[in-house]
């Protein structure tokens, strides 16, 4: 006899035990990835070698480490335990983030940024390709992932004013940017252990599920995996030469250049245009991030309601490009903040 499952109750359970802790991991990851953008507002005063060119290269070196270790890390997690691997990712990136406070040379700056990328590399594929499929069926996954995607903007809303405030703290004789790196490394280090106890990598291990719920999720996952094996398999070369894949890669590349360029340079650009203090810049940046969060939810709902995808993406990218393009030509601080708001809506 088949036992009826309360789907709403089951989803609420997974919201608390899976989506919420993974959401917090994503928030912490974003904070530690881009805190260098805020530290850059004051680092150059204490590190004479830190030119804009070196800062930009160091910000980008992160993605070199990310590139080399993303796929291997995801394969390891798929073979062993996704939750243990996510905890490892968090702990190691927290250590590297803390070490950033003690860098003294250009080489160390590049090294730590590379290591940060290498440590964090497989986080997204492990979450979306390894952990979530075991907990959420195909029809539920979009809802779970959409909730996760808001984590970047939530992190920016909380992280920008926090970073600005920390930059004006000189604890134990350290500079503000050193304080920022050390204190923002702590959440990753501490939450590692919370995450290990909070999240299980598969339903069978979850004490908060009933036996029927465990069996239901396990059976749904196995059926989905069985269907996947019947789909045509592509070689790596076939995937890399597929025209649709190449077009999507180009679109994603063009968007990601604007997205990360905006995130890494926005604090310094606003500070340069306005002359405001680091703390005021931090609080000001929370405004465009808040507007972008509202726009992201509204834009996603509009796309889901109408079923239209291409023009929603194209319009957002155009808005972002317009905001980025006009910002350098605006000298008034409040108007420049308005331009940044436009850019944030588009690129986010």
Show which residues each predicted segment covers.
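Helix-to-loop junctions at the C-terminal end of transmembrane segments
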Residues: 69-81, 167, 295-308
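C-terminal transmembrane helical hairpin of 12-TM major facilitator-type secondary transporters
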Residues: 307-348
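Extracytoplasmic gate region of multi-pass secondary transporters
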Residues: 36-37, 237-296, 300
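Cytoplasmic helix-loop-helix junction between adjacent transmembrane helices
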Residues: 112-150
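Cytoplasmic membrane-interface "Motif A"-like loop-to-helix N-cap segments
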Residues: 78-90, 304-317
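Helix-breaking motifs and short loop linkers at transmembrane-helix boundaries and internal kinks
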Residues: 49, 81, 102-108, 119, ...
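Glycine-rich segments within core transmembrane alpha-helices of 12-TM secondary carriers
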Residues: 142-167, 187-188
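Conserved MFS/SLC helix-loop-helix module at the cytosolic interface between two early adjacent transmembrane helices
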Residues: 68-107
């Amino acid at each position: 006899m088949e036992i009826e499952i309360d789907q709403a109750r089951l989803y609420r359970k997974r919201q608390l035990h899976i989506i919420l802790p993974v959401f917090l991991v994503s928030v912490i990851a974003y904070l530690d990835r881009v805190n260098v953008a805020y530290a850059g507002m004051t680092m150059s005063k204490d590190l004479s070698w830190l030119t804009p060119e070196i800062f930009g290269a160091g910000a980008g070196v992160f993605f070199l480490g990310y590139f080399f270790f993303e796929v291997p890390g995801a394969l390891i997690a798929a073979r062993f335990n996704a939750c243990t691997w996510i905890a490892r990712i968090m702990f190691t990136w927290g250590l590297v983030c803390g070490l950033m406070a003690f860098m003294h040379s250009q080489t160390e700056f590049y090294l730590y940024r590379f290591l940060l990328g290498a440590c964090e590399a497989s986080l997204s594929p492990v979450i979306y390709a390894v952990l979530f499929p075991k907990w959420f069926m195909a029809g539920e996954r979009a809802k779970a992932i959409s909730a996760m995607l808001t984590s970047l903007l939530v992190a920016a809303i909380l992280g920008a004013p926090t970073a600005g405030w920390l930059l004006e703290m000189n604890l134990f004789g350290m500079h503000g940017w050193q304080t920022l790196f050390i204190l923002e490394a702590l959440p990753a280090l501490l939450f590692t252990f919370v995450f290990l106890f909070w999240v299980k990598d598969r339903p069978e291990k979850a004490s908060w599920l009933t036996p029927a719920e465990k069996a239901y999720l396990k059976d749904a996952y196995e059926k989905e995996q069985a269907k996947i094996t019947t789909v045509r398999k592509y070689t790596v070369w076939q995937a890399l030469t597929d025209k649709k894949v190449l077009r999507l890669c180009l679109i994603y590349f063009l968007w990601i250049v604007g997205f990360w360029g905006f995130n890494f340079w926005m604090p310094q650009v606003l500070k340069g245009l306005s002359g405001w203090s680091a703390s005021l810049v931090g609080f000001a940046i929370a405004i465009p991030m808040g507007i972008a969060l509202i726009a992201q939810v509204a834009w996603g709902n509009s796309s889901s309601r109408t079923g239209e995808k291409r023009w929603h993406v194209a319009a957002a990218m155009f808005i972002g490009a317009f905001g980025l393009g006009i910002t350098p030509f605006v000298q008034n601080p409040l108007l420049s903040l308005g331009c940044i708001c436009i850019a944030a809506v588009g690129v986010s």
